[in-house]
Amino acid sequence: MRYPESLLKLTRALSRLPGIGPKTAQRLALHLAFHKEEAEALAEALEGLKRVRACRECGNLAEGELCPICQDEDRDRSLLAVVESVADLYALERSGEFRGLYHVLGGALNPLEGIGPKELNLEGLFRRLEGVEEVVLATSMTVEGEATALYLAEELKKRGVRVTRPAYGLPVGGSLEYADEVTLGRALEGRRPV
């Protein structure tokens, strides 16, 4: 069956997005074709993305020079969480528990992929340390994330900053039976009194 070219173009564009396969892309395109108000709202939102850029301080997404978090005077400026990506920053923000500032590295050390310290936003991090008392290394629990955390811990300690890592543990609602050995071991190491 032949589809209108504009529908095919939209379907191809949608299918390039993460988590959207060809069938889902086609369903979305058809939905938008029959719901013009939603299509216009989506087009307007996509147009607005042209104003989004990296925050000059932390690397988060911003519509101006600074992101809303860096602009927030109520944030604890003595506390800085280092994350690999903006998605990681948003995950920490959703917890509602972290009230400091963030720094987005833009990845993790990965020599096999040619990603060394110079490929990450480290100079920006080191420039931000004045007034920072604690840096939380909130990198992922992968080999690359751990290597990045170890490297940064050494560099930050040389600069006289307290360095911490988030506690490891079991997920809420998770069963011990299904937890891997490393997670269980770290959960036991990090146990605290009740």
From Swiss-Prot:
Alphabetical list of Pfam families matching this protein: RecR_C, RecR_HhH, RecR_ZnF, Toprim_4
Signal peptide: none
SUPFAM superfamilies linked to this entry: Recombination protein RecR
Keywords: DNA damage, DNA recombination, DNA repair, Metal-binding, Zinc, Zinc-finger
BP-aspect Gene Ontology terms: DNA recombination; DNA repair
Positions of C4-type zinc fingers: 55-70
Superkingdom of this protein's organism: Bacteria
Keyword Metal-binding: yes
Toprim domain segment(s): 78-171
GO molecular function annotations of the record: DNA binding; zinc ion binding
Purpose of the protein: May play a role in DNA repair. It seems to be involved in an RecBC-independent recombinational process of DNA repair. It may act with RecF and RecO.
Similarity field: Belongs to the RecR family.
Protein's name according to its UniProt entry: Recombination protein RecR
Organism encoding this protein: Thermus thermophilus (strain ATCC BAA-163 / DSM 7039 / HB27)
Gene designation per UniProt: recR
